[in-house]
Amino acid sequence: MPKLKTRKSARKRFYISAKGKFVRKRAFKSHILEKKTSKRKRNLKRKMIVFKGENLALKTMLPYLR
């Protein structure tokens, strides 16, 4: 059986936490930050856990991620 390929775009965006959950960055933090409040920008720094329904798709895209 051939090796499974990793989706490089997904590998750059997701990782697995210590508890085994997929984690990602939040959107809207890259540019046009002047009009966003400090509180909003501070909260956007935090990571976000991916919804359970997307776990199967991510496991397919990232077969060797531990």
From Swiss-Prot:
InterPro entries listed in its UniProt record: Ribosomal_bL35, Ribosomal_bL35-like, Ribosomal_bL35_CS, Ribosomal_bL35_sf
GO molecular function terms noted in the UniProt entry: structural constituent of ribosome
GO cellular component: chloroplast; large ribosomal subunit
Keywords of the record: Chloroplast, Plastid, Ribonucleoprotein, Ribosomal protein
UniProt GO BP: translation
Entry-linked Pfam families: Ribosomal_L35p (PF01632)
Localization: Plastid, Chloroplast
Main location: plastid
SUPFAM superfamilies found in the cross-reference section: L35p-like (SSF143034)
Family statement drawn from the similarity comment of this UniProt entry: Belongs to the bacterial ribosomal protein bL35 family.
NCBIfam families: rpmI_bact
The protein, known as: Large ribosomal subunit protein bL35c
